[in-house]
Amino acid sequence: MDMTGILPLAKPRGMTSHDCVAKLRRLLKTKKVGHTGTLDPDVYGVLPVCIGHATKVAQYMSDYPKAYEGEVTVGFSTTTEDRSGDTVETKTIQQPFVEAVVDQVLATFVGEIKQIPPMYSAVKVRGKRLYEYARAGITVERPERTVTIFSLERMSDIVYEEGVCRFRFNVSCSKGTYVRTLAVDIGKALGYPAHMSDLVRTKSGPFSLEECFTFTELEERLEQGEGSSLLLPIETAILDIPRVQVNKEIEEKIRHGAVLPQKWFNHPRFTVYNEEGALLAIYKAHPSKDGFVKPEKMLANDQQ
């Protein structure tokens, strides 16, 4: 069974993104499986996975904006910035926050913000991932990064118990945003240590949690011989790239990987479809021939 397409997977808690890829390779009996952005093991939610020839477009999916539903616990911080870590600092909440003040604090994070990646993260510093240093008990200086918070809103009451409080929030953000770190920074802005106590990724680019499938659902469909029915077309993943439709004459040139004049297309990068609406290729500006475009990915069926 030749399976090609995008599988919108609902990643279960307790599995790494790599675990999911390994399991899918076994289930689908193919090595051509690739995920498009790491989700922490404790996080449940949207993980778009490229199957078969769809792995060719994985690189275009890593820049997707993301959306999450999370929970911040205010009153103590942890080594990992989430609930899996050891407690680092505690500070008892003596009196309830004014909800309007909390909402005002959240509003201050909307827009471009600076973040320092957590020590327990996959960011590389001097050739090693930060979590490798962290596990060895070494703290290293981490490069600050700029990310964008498109929206951030509290979506539950603030619940108090035993000197801490927690509330749920929705956040929409650019790629590379650490929501754990955001939770810690929200606590700092309120004057308390804090950590992220729960997280669900609800959206990744055009893929939302409502349309994702669990491993159980996938296994059931495979048993019925209908596994490919869960896959979305490759073009679903690259809808944000400008689209150009070409006639039969230009289609023939594109199928042969021709370098073409950019003035025909007016885009530095674009997807190419034929008159029947079939995806042929992704083209980009030629790096050395000014005024021309060249194929970046050949995606026509007979090229696969």
Swiss-Prot record:
SUPFAM superfamilies hit by this protein: Pseudouridine synthase
Enzyme Commission no: 5.4.99.25
Residues annotated as catalytic: D40 (nucleophile)
Keywords: Isomerase, tRNA processing
Pfam family, one: TruB_C_2
Keyword tRNA processing belongs to the record: yes
Alphabetical list of CDD domains matching this protein: PseudoU_synth_EcTruB
GO MF terms held by the record: RNA binding; tRNA pseudouridine(55) synthase activity
Protein name (Swiss-Prot/TrEMBL): tRNA pseudouridine synthase B
